[in-house]
Amino acid sequence: MQASRLGWSSYGDTQYVAHVLRYYPYGRAFTAGGNQAIVEVALTQVGNQGGQPYWSWYGFDSRVEWCACFVSWCADQCGYIESGLVPKFAGCVDGANWFKSHNQWHDRNYEPKAGDIIFFDWGGDGITDHVGIVEKCENGTVYTVEGNSGDACKQRTYAVGSSSIYGYGIPAY
């Protein structure tokens, strides 16, 4: 065998997989595309405290309200910002307005799909003030992954049509 003549115990790079995967976000290739990819990225971030990777990626030098930075960061990891599927936004109002202006918007009574962007109105004043990513919707319950939920990335649940839901941005995956 050529390998043993050259003094090798095997052919090729024994660390090939690790060396290739370093070029993928989080060291792994996505198992799904489209709307599921952003959910997979978001789920890898559950437990992050303080949001530093997201607001610093966006360009801020110090901590800001970072829920929108988190959503944008997740979208960027999937190539969705570069491809124009999801806007890069640091303010919830800007993100909601982008989806509305592109006719990719549904109100709170819509039954969302995985990968939809969920906007909230905690104050009940008709202005969105928080945003997350829909993980799934089952039996009238919306499951989300949100950044800056108590200053951490967390999974949360809401009833479809909840008064705290402002609406949904629907990326054209």
Identify the role of each PLM range.
Residues M1-E40, S162-Y173:
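Non-catalytic cell-wall polysaccharide-engagement segments
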Residues Q2-S10, N48-Q52, Y80-I81, I127:
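Secretory-pathway/luminal and periplasmic proteins that interact with or process carbohydrate-rich
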Residues T14-V17, V64, A68, P112:
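Short alpha-helical patches at coil-to-helix transitions and adjacent helical residues
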